[in-house]
Amino acid sequence: MAGNALANYVQVYVMLPLDVITVDNTFEKEDETRAQLKKLTEAGADGVMIDVWWGLVEGKEPGVYDWSAYRQVFKLVQEAGLKLQAIMSCHQCGGNVGDVVNIPIPQWVRDVGKSNPDIFYTNRSGLTNIEYLTLGVDDQPLFHGRTAIQLYADYMKSFRENMADFLDAGVVVDIEVGLGPAGEMRYPSYPQSQGWVFPGVGEFICYDKYLQADFKAAAEEAGHPEWDLLDDAGTYNDTPEKTQFFADNGTYQTDKGKFFLTWYSNKLIKHGDKILDEANKVFLGCKVQLAIKVSGIHWWYNVPNHAAELTAGYYNLDDRDGYRTIAHMLTRHRASMNFTCAEMRDSEQSSEAKSAPEELVQQVLSAGWREGLNLACENALNRYDATAYNTILRNARPQGINKNGPPEHKLHGFTYLRVSDELFQEQNYTTFKTFVRRMHANLDYNPNVDPVAPLERSKAEIPIEEILEVAQPKLEPFPFDKDTDLPV
C-alpha cells in the first residue's frame, strides 16, 4: 500500500527570503537561516528554492564571478538534509509585487545601456525598463563582445563549475532558468515601477530599436511593408474597452492584429527555447530538472480579449491556447513548467478585474499535462490560511488521491512563497505542517520520491509552425474536483 500511496506524494519546497544574501554579496544571516532550515525540516518540507542573483555574482566586472556567499548558503541547506531549487535570476529584484530588496542587474551591463538604452525593454512612449535585457539583444554582441545569451550561458557555466560538489551530491535538483522580469517568461508589461496598478491591461513592450527592426522585417517578409507596431493598445492602466486594440471587434481580431500577436508571442517562445538549449548544454549529465516560470495573469481572463495576458506575451484567447504552445516548446528540452497563483479562488477576486485564476490554472496545467510535462506551481501572494492551502491541494491532485497507484494527474512539486517570521508563528506554522503532510498524501517525508535522471541533450529544434499547430483547437481543460479530498 505504501508504494501506491507514495505515487500521490507531491514534493513541497519553500522559497528562501529574497535578501538571504546581502546586496554586497555576503552571507550574514547564518544563525537565522540555520534556524529557518531546521523549522522547514521539522515541517517535513522536501527542500528550498533560492534566487541566485546575477547582479550579485557577476556584479563587479565581466567574467568575474564570486560564488562564496552562495556556497555558504548551499552548505547549510545540505547540512539540513534539504534539496535545493536554484533560480538563475538574471533579472533585477525590485519593482515587482513583494520585492523587499533592490538587487539590480550588473553595473557593467547597465553601463552599456547608458550609451545604448535600447538594450532594455522599451514601451511605446520610450520608457525603458532596466529589470531585464530586451530579448531583442539575445544575439547582439553588445556586452564587451558577448551577446545577451552568451552572458546567461557563461553565468550558468560558472554556476555549474563552482557548485559541482552540490550538483554531484544531489543537493541541487532543479535549475529554474530565468527568462524575464521576476524570473518569468514574459515581457515587463505591468511594471509597478512605472505606475502600473492592478487591474490595468498593461502595455506591449517591444519598442526598442532591435524589436522594432525585427517587426519591420517580419512584416515585409509577410508582404505587408506598410504595417508598423501598434499605436492603439492604450497604456498601463487602461481597461480593455478604452482601447481600440482590445475593444469588441478590436484590432486584435484583424489580420494585422493577429500577425502582431503571433510575432510578439513567438519571439518570447524562441527566447525561452534558445536559453533552455544553452542551459541544457551546460547541465548535460547533471541530475537536475530544468524548469521555467510562467506568470499567472488572471485579470481580464474572463473577457474575450484576454488583454493582460496578451501584453505579457501569452497569445491566449477563448479559441486559442497560448500556454500549450509554450508547453510544446518545453518538450524539446524535457523541461518543467512552474506556474503561479495556485492558491487563488475566483470568489476572492474583484468583479471589475474579470479575473479567473481557477480557470487559468486549470487551462495551464491541462496544457502541460497534455504535452507530458512535469508541472510545478507556487502561490502568488503570502497566505497562511486553510482556504488557500486547500485550493493548492485541489490543484496539486485535481482528481484526488488514488489508493491504487498514481493519481490521474498530479503536480511534480509545489514551491511555497516564502520563508518569513510570520510563517513560523505558532498557528501559521502548525497549519503549514498539516499542509505539507497533506501534500505528501499523509505520508512521512521521503527523500526518494521522483528521483531525477541525468539530463539528456535537448532534442532537435521544433519548427515554430509545428509549435503553433497545438494552439488550436483549444481543448477543454481536464475536470478538476471542486474541493480537495485531503483538506487541511
Swiss-Prot record:
For this protein, the record's InterPro entries field holds: Glyco_hydro_14, Glyco_hydro_14_CS, Glyco_hydro_14B_pln, Glycoside_hydrolase_SF
Keywords from the UniProt entry: Carbohydrate metabolism, Glycosidase, Hydrolase, Polysaccharide degradation
Q: Which GO terms describe its biological process?
A: polysaccharide catabolic process
Q: Name one Pfam family in it.
A: Glyco_hydro_14
What family is this protein classified in?
Belongs to the glycosyl hydrolase 14 family.
Report whether Hydrolase shows up as a keyword of the record. Answer: yes
The protein's Enzyme Commission number? 3.2.1.2
Query: Where along this sequence does the record place binding of substrate?
Result: 51, 91, 99, 293, 298, 340, 379-380, 418
- Broad enzyme group: hydrolase
| Gene Ontology terms for molecular function | beta-amylase activity
Matches recorded under Gene3D superfamilies? Glycosidases
PROSITE patterns according to UniProt: BETA_AMYLASE_1, BETA_AMYLASE_2
Q: Does the keyword Repressor apply?
A: no
Q: Which organism is it from?
A: Zea mays (Maize)
Indicate what this protein is called per its UniProt record: Beta-amylase
**What residues form the catalytic site here?**
184 (proton donor), 378 (proton acceptor)
Name the chemical reaction catalysed here: Hydrolysis of (1->4)-alpha-D-glucosidic linkages in polysaccharides so as to remove successive maltose units from the non-reducing ends of the chains
